Amino acid sequence: MAKEKYERTKPHVNIGTIGHVDHGKTTLTAAISKVLHDEYPDLNPEYDFNQIDAAPEEQQRGITINIAHIEYQTAKRHYAHVDCPGHADFVKNMITGAAQMDGAILVVAATDGPMAQTREHVLLAPQVGVPKILVALNKCDMVDDEELIELVEEEVRDLLDENGFDRDCPVVHTSAYGALHDDAPDHDKWVATIKELMDDVDEYIPTPVHDLDKPFLMPIEDVFTISGRGTVVTGRVERGKLPINTNVEIVGIRPTQTTTFTSIETFHKQMDECEAGDNTGLLLRGINRTDVERGQVVAAPGSVTPHTKFEGEVYVLTKDEGGRHSPFFSNYRPQFYFRTTDVTGVITLPEGVEMVQPGDHATFTVELIQPIAMEEGLTFAVREGGHTVGSGRVTKILA
């Protein structure tokens, strides 16, 4: 059966839910898609709540691990929504997911207020390029005292302010559970709050200006085989646009390969061309599943090159921000998280600098054990033992 064609009729915006484990991010995602389905049934498919937490181990533990993409539409826009994991071990996946957001809904339970992972996500958001955050104050049906809700709201606004976000952003008092379940008390009231939240998202999160004129680049997030057709790589197009049957290079980690892609899909719909901001699958001609991996990029030929040695400008997180408790020295070997993958690298501090303390802004040289498609200005996270300990950008490519 021929697949539906993807139509670009409305502005497309990538948003997502971030926040602490069990504060209701996935429930809110389900509530948004249900409320919008009920309001605009022609525009929005019905999603099963359990589909969002897709992997079996997640349902056993009740924790969202990988990233779930769903799509929905308001009257004004088409959205791709990423439900980001909230569990501390999975911040790595949050980084890959959050790098795909034009704005985020921070979900905070009114019963708890901001918790450790709320803080970590807000801290990471600017590093992974999330420009705007608004707030869903969830579980308001479980708090009788209006003053307590106001206190939590104030605390959330302070947290946003401390991390460079707008403290006067929209904050919606809601209950995702109440809006999702028809038999919940005050169901209609909570549905109205979800509509209010989406009106705020429409207004507050700006339509992104995608870099269509720059050379095409898509970081590879996943690779799989479609039997009889070939290898598909998926990811979000970072910049540029690409018509079908165009030559591309696969750059990074391994020697650069040239190939052509013969099909483009987004949300299971066929496209003739993909462009910046699209979540896309590309079918590559003559490439085996084992020839490509997450962490490489698909790029316009000659537009980006692989490098292992660079100078970086880095902010080192303090202990309170979840970073290291002690300084590090030359020959420190953490992981450097570029786009969608971790690569180990060796740090060399500049002459005259003996060590770098938590809380410092530092410049140092890094030599990676594998080449990464790199340009000046590329951002990265520094990670150790599963925790983010710093964030930085490439200031100068050395080799």
UniProtKB/Swiss-Prot annotation:
Record-annotated tr-type G domain positions: 10-209
Residues the record lists as binding GTP: 19-26, 83-87, 138-141
Annotated region described as G4, given as residue ranges: 138-141
Chain intervals for the UniProt region annotation (G2): 62-66
Chain residue ranges for the region called G1: 19-26
Major subcellular site: cytoplasm
GO cellular component: cytosol
The protein's name: Elongation factor Tu
Organism per entry: Bifidobacterium animalis subsp. lactis (strain AD011)
Gene responsible for this protein: tuf
